[in-house]
Amino acid sequence: MLSNHKTLYVALLILLGSFTLRFLHLGDIPGPTFDEVFYPRYGFNYLTGENFYYVHPPLANYLYAASIWIYNQLPWIDITAIDTLQFEQLNPLSYRWLNALLGSLLCPLAYFFAYAIWKNNNFALIVSFFVAIDGSLLVDSRFALANIYIVFFGLSALLCAAKSQSADVNPRYWLLSSGVLLGLVVSVKWNGL
């Protein structure tokens, strides 16, 4: 796994490309667009203490709330109090950056999963490359859509399950991790079932 320098350089190049595709001009699209009028808004409602009804489990909304809060704590962000803002006044970058980060991290995750199954560096690099350039994953990573959390936690769960089959030490820890991650998948949206 990443045994030689050439493989490591190619993997890092794919990761750099993935970050570039997801973060370049991330805040340029004025928001909220598409389903961003729902998911990040509900996260914002958690921050402001506003009551609302939501049909899905709350993890994605908690993550959006954390994303907005962390972004607004940055020293170069000049904001008086988040309670005084309306959702439409938020910088779209505040609720999109976490999706872009997790979408970028899908590439090494896909590499490690493919390597855990097939034990072939070249195949794992191809899988990682296709995850980096996949159009659907790019859209889900660049907009505040909850689907990227399902994919990220789901692929992490599969990786842990694959590791449990080849673990030299006690595989129960890998299986327990896989179960916790599957619980996170279900706590994002019901279609995670």
Where are the language model's segments positioned?
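Membrane-interface transmembrane helices that cradle and orient dolichyl/undecaprenyl
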Residues: 1, 116-118, 157-175, 185
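Transmembrane-helix motifs of polytopic, lipid-linked glycan transferases
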Residues: 12, 16, 85, 89, ...
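Transmembrane helices and adjacent periplasmic/lumenal helix-loop junctions
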Residues: 136, 141, 176, 180-193
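Interfacial juxtamembrane loops and adjacent helix segments
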Residues: 52-100
